A protein has these predicted regions:
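Minor-groove-contacting beta-hairpin "wing" of winged helix-turn-helix DNA-binding domains
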Residues: 15-26
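Short glycine/proline-centered loop/turn elements that form peptide/ligand docking sites
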Residues: 48-49, 58, 82, 149-150, ...
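A glycine-centered beta-loop-beta connector
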Residues: 65, 73-90, 133, 141-164
Length: 181
């Protein structure tokens, strides 16, 4: 019985005081989970970005996507700044279009341009990033650093995907949430 109580104390559900004994802290497990998640920033969860230069062909974007085993590739300009995103869906639409030869068409012709992108910063909460992914029905967000305040000039510093969030949930369920701080 004492070991069960010790687990509940370590989990924050119970507390123990000398001469008082064990007592309920008022925290439920869902509240504790939300508290844990709210303290995690995008920088703690992000993965390495995969990018192609804007002058590459759509075919080269496909090759990069397969070699890196990702579903989204960021498109960068000559200065290394984010220009757009090309997803599997974008490439599939281009592949079934009879007017496009993927080996010849530039990736900028099939990408989603910067003006339509949703981005996150490393300081954003993972909850806010997850909300953006859900609300916009996308698989991946670029993690960016703003080059000039008030402009849309971004350096890509990472990416955050549904897989990152799934890994976080599994780690939290297995009690490994401390790995993200």
């Amino acid at each position: 019985m004492r070991s069960d109580l010790a687990i509940l104390v370590m989990g924050g559900i119970l507390d123990a005081r000398p001469k008082v004994g064990y007592f309920y802290t008022g925290k439920n497990t869902l509240g504790m989970l939300m508290e844990e998640i709210s303290g995690i920033c995008v920088r703690d969860l992000q993965s390495v970005p995969v990018a192609v230069n804007h002058d590459k062909s759509a075919y080269e974007a496909v090759i990069t996507m397969f070699l890196e085993d990702v579903g989204t590739v960021f498109v960068i300009d000559d200065a290394g700044l984010l220009a757009g995103v090309v997803s599997r869906k974008d490439l599939l639409k281009a592949a079934i279009n009879n007017n496009y030869n993927l080996r010849e068409v530039p990736v900028v012709m099939v990408m989603t341009p910067l003006s339509k992108l949703i981005v996150v910063t490393p300081e954003d909460s993972v909850a806010a990033a997850a909300r953006k992914i859900i609300d916009n029905e996308i698989d991946c967000l670029p993690v960016v650093r703003c080059i000039e305040e008030g402009s849309r000039s971004y350096e890509v510093v990472g990416r955050i995907t549904k897989t990152n969030f799934t890994r976080l949930l599994v780690d939290l369920a297995e009690g490994k949430g401390g790995n993200y701080r």
